[in-house]
């Protein structure tokens, strides 16, 4: 009593306390960062190594394996995958959430150093690492185009000046430059001319290397002067290499230009990038795992004007893709939804209380509670994101509930003629414990979420804490500011005021009278209600088992990614044509705004595309509908497949794949894996629950297998080293020398001119100089035949791995797909030597599925414990919790009705319902217990009176929660696919719960009261206290 009186009779102090809460919240709001979702990125580090010309199997055994053994010893590595292709190896290390990325990077560098002695000596550089996940979609893509500059010059400018500058911006983890390669002097050899002159490829390589050196020459000095010695020991352009003497034949000089075509070109000609049908260099910018995407993008945009000034006028720098506009639009939609929810909740209060003065009170209390929450969010290091703003939207209904319970009870005393200050004090005292019980039991629902580990726990923690803080502030404000405002603002009702909104008032009275009559009938037929309650419990179980499930709702971020996979023997020229064809098909779609893509590098038969869709208000289809439409058109393109997927804000794992979900096959027996992977992939491709099934195992690449006759080689004076060097010199784009320039270093690349390698007969023109100086054709000591070879070799841990990727067809859920895959694996009878498991997001889904039921049970148990402590009873918490089955049925039926799968967002809705629907029972039970203690009523009379007296606040709180969630259901625009499942779950649960719990709660109350009396040692005792 004294606590409430302290605030009621000191209005200035109470107002200033509320102002302080509001001011702190405003300051916190201004400093909160903006993000699509809470920070849930795993720390990921990518290690890269190269050995030009080495086969995928050579890279895997000689480069990947030594590095994996060393990197695998690092603490906190949750997953290690590697992919080795022609001349390159990439190892992805994913760490535990709590692992510091900088500390992990130091450990990675130490592991690389430890493995250095085990790596091949011919590697052009040491392995490097980057603190970025290559499988993440870029947060921004910049393109460079020009009508005058070559692709090599554009690439040089991008990699030398733009990429380093952008990499220094806070939050940027990696800037990947694609579409070409650095400038280089290319030496294209003529095998026949070399043979005629008696010059070997090694002779050419040695001559070029010796002619271009960069060594210190020292200095000269006398008594007064000092001269630095400088020589013309470097050759920098193709024109300078052309006249280089590489050999003497019969006294005549053989110059490089006599046996080769020397051009200023690029290091790797098998690279191509495009933007909207125009050749382009792409700068794909990815953020650090812990960075905020909006802040990083804003920093890059702020830097762009400065970068524009350094660019020649003939180079056009454009933003081809930016993730931030859809994120901002999504957050604006949530903010609008929040405002609408507040307005609707206040409207509910006005309709029920029929007083403008009374309505002002929640109109003040709700903003104070919500705004004050921003301060706590800032102190906790949270951000303004879809989940935290949705938590505040839902909190609108919760925070007004506390105010409604206090306000309605005070209003009831005022209507009975009590003076305002006395009514405020008496009304608050009566419901203070009720409000405390409602708030504490609601916060208790989220305690299991705070203890939940892994990605789901990290994702839900921000939601739970934000909502809990809002409820805590609401509890404080409702017991301080609300009674003070009631005492000083409200007046005793007058007859003319009671006539306002007569229609709604009469309707409410009629509803209450009808409810009273129906409740009397129900209390006389309790067994029937018991059967209904048991039926809802059984229906809950059946609906949960049968409803489709997924991890997270499919988002429409306005960005698509596409992976091209062509025939494994395709040439680069043909692959570039496929890229152009696919880009034209997509560019012609009316919903597409921009298309960029690239192909080439170590995997000639693959490519990537990044597609920006038009804003949601300029297109009628969702991203998935656009993908479905494009899939039909793209399927008509022969010789290649383009797999499209919508970019999501949550992506788990470091595997780069052509689809959203992965299923990984592991084996220590590589032969068994290669045997069973095609069988499994073909089987999965027939399943209607899966779409776009593809694999990263490609074993049918064209290979030319050379078999040396070692006896013949020994007789001819040729060793294997010389023969292998010949092949590397001829076909490996071998980097044989370095050209040093002020801004960068460039390479001299030697190979047989592509004009002479158009078919297999090119091998017949190759020759080796033996130890006697004679030219011996390769065909003298080697035979060759075409064969199949892998284009890549993949590992997970230290086991051979193959990952099958898939998307979900429209109308199918991840639970449907995972169940279908499990059935297919069983039907195929896959041997135990080949192990299959879900990876990435699909793996997290499996883990979440296993913990969902435990989480719900833990939440219910926590609420039971809190209620038991508050009521000092084992029984009354069960009465209150009996409201939950009907809410679960309503939520699951609503999801089924809207064809929405049960996702992590729907799970949040279920957890919220546990907290919401029990409020009705708390109000009933509190007043029934009070009536039994002080009114000398029987249990049946007490619960009946409690139901009627609390009918109005029950309706008010339920409608407030319902109207607070309704905008989530009806919202459209960006991010609606996240908001709608939450709103659907809450609205469906509230409607069903309201229909049933008004009858089931009093029946359960009476049932447990009879049970208590039956087992009580003191039968005459009426109430358990």
From Swiss-Prot:
Keywords: Cell inner membrane, Cell membrane, Membrane, Transmembrane, Transmembrane helix, Transport. It holds the Pfam family ACR_tran. SUPFAM superfamilies: Multidrug efflux transporter AcrB pore domain, PN1, PN2, PC1 and PC2 subdomains, Multidrug efflux transporter AcrB TolC docking domain, DN and DC subdomains, Multidrug efflux transporter AcrB transmembrane domain. The keyword Cell inner membrane applies. Signal peptide: none annotated. GO terms for cellular component: plasma membrane. It is a multi-pass membrane protein. InterPro entries: AcrB_DN_DC_subdom, Acrflvin-R, Multidrug-R_MdtC. Gene3D superfamilies: Multidrug efflux transporter AcrB pore domain, Multidrug efflux transporter AcrB pore domain like, Multidrug efflux transporter AcrB TolC docking domain, DN and DC subdomains, Multidrug efflux transporter AcrB transmembrane domain. The chain crosses the membrane at residues 3-23, 333-353, 360-380, 387-407, 431-451, 463-483, 528-548, 853-873, 875-895, 897-917, 953-973, 984-1004. Induction: The mdtABC operon is transcriptionally activated by BaeR. It is found in: Cell inner membrane. Part of a tripartite efflux system composed of MdtA, MdtB and MdtC. MdtC forms a heteromultimer with MdtB. The MdtABC tripartite complex confers resistance against novobiocin and deoxycholate. HAMAP family: MdtC. Belongs to the resistance-nodulation-cell division (RND) (TC 2.A.6) family. MdtC subfamily. This is Multidrug resistance protein MdtC. The gene is mdtC.
